[in-house]
Each structure stands twice: as C-alpha cells, then as structure tokens.
Amino acid sequence: MKKSFSYSSNELSKPKQFIINSIEKISGRKKLEKLYQQYDEESRAPHLFWSDVKNLLKLKVNIKSVQQLNIPKKGPLIIIANHPFGIIDGIILASLVSEVRSDFKIITHQVLRFTEASQQFILPVDFSAGQQALKNNVKTGRNAKKFLQEGGVIILFPAGGVAMAKKIYTPAIDAEWGKLLGSLSLNTDADVIPIFFDGKNGILFHLFASKLKSQTLKYSSYMHETKRKIGKTIDIYCGEVVPNKKLKLINDKKQITLLLRDITMSLPVRG
C-alpha cells in the first residue's frame, strides 16, 4: 500500500495543510511520486527498498575519505551524520547500511514512511508543538534504546532539522545536536560511526526556509531539493568506529554529544 509522499498531515490545521501541499506541488513532489510509482515494492526484500530508491533517484555516493565505511555485520551500532540535504541524507545512509545489514532503523520525519516497505525502518520524529509531540519523541527515544539493546543499528541525525546557512555563500551548519545521542551511548553498548555529508542545499532553499518559523513548513520545501539531487553524486567522509567504552568513560550525555559532533565535523579536514 502506497501513501502520500508529503509532509502534510491531518494533525495540522487546514490552512497549514493547504500551504504545505501547495509548496510541494510546485517544488517537485509529483516528480518524486512518479518515480516511485515505477517501483514494485512487493518483489523485493524490504531492507533493499532504500538501495532501490537511491537507484530510482539515480544517486551516486562518492566516499572522499581514506577511511572507508566499515559497518560490522552484527552488534549494536549508532551511525550519525550531519544533515545538509534532507530526505536524501536518510535515503543514502539507509542504502549504505542495507548493503551489510537488514536490522536497522532511522530516526527521522515520518514522511519517509510513505510505503509499507519503509515503515518498519522508521522511528518517527514529531516536529509539531505541544505535549503530545514531546510524548511521541520520548517514545521514539525509548524504542531506539530498546532496538540497540537488542543488537540493531540506529541511524541518527542529531541536529534534527536540516542544516542552514546564515549567509548565502557560507557553509550550512547543523543546529545544536540533541542529547539523545549521548543518552543512547550511555544506556546501550553501541559503538558509533560518524559520517559527514559534503555540501548544502541550493540558494533558494536557504533564502526561503530561513524565513519560515514552522519546522513542518521548512520540511515541505525539501521536495524541491530532493528533485534537484536526482542524478547527482553525493560526497561523504567516513570516520573510524568510536568504541562505546571510550564514550562511557566520559559519562556525560552533553560532553559525549559534543565530542561526537566535533569528530563528525572534522572528517573533511582529516581526509
């Protein structure tokens, strides 16, 4: 069963739903949906969905670092990354993990649950305001912890939202990373692999999205950026595995998060 590929939902007000749908229609949603309609999810193993989507979008991944991506075939693992592009980031990381393992989940916006093939791999983040959103996100954190304790892989973008550039020609920088990363490191035995995406969204995105206060409205503009990436090569840098034992020695969620952010952001410098 295929669902609407949209950031709009019934939980939003009617005016906001209208605005989001309008933005998406003029910025690439139809193109993405048409591509997906060519895909028969029932003929493939569920975890291969992500590689198939990457191929549908004709995306290529270029690892620029000397260090290659070394995902262990078993055991708890957290894969973290900066978040410059949006939907593309999640698709690429999930596709890379799926080449080695099928026991993984992504903490991300529920828009990627638009098909049964993807639903089982998504731990949704609720970007709406209010107590219910808080409860939903606490539940996602607990589910992530449980999944790691069972030996699975969690893909996490600790900044939550997509990186923004303060000025048009400056780099896009992640917002402050949340404490979930530190919490998961302290409360599980998961090692961490950092990955850095090289690049940022287009000028129009940063001009437009920076003016929007609503996180959901910002997300609706990602459709255009996803369409722009069709057929492109995405450059990434991979880091060495950070052992869980090293992180537990720090014994502070905030400091663990800061350390892992510094490691991730320095990957291009290390080469």
Give the positions of each predicted feature.
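Short, flexible loop segments at the rims of nucleotide/cofactor-binding pockets, characterized by
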Residues: 54-59, 130-135, 170-171
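Residue-level detector of flexible, active-site-proximal loop/helix-junction positions
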Residues: 68, 111-113, 129, 199, ...
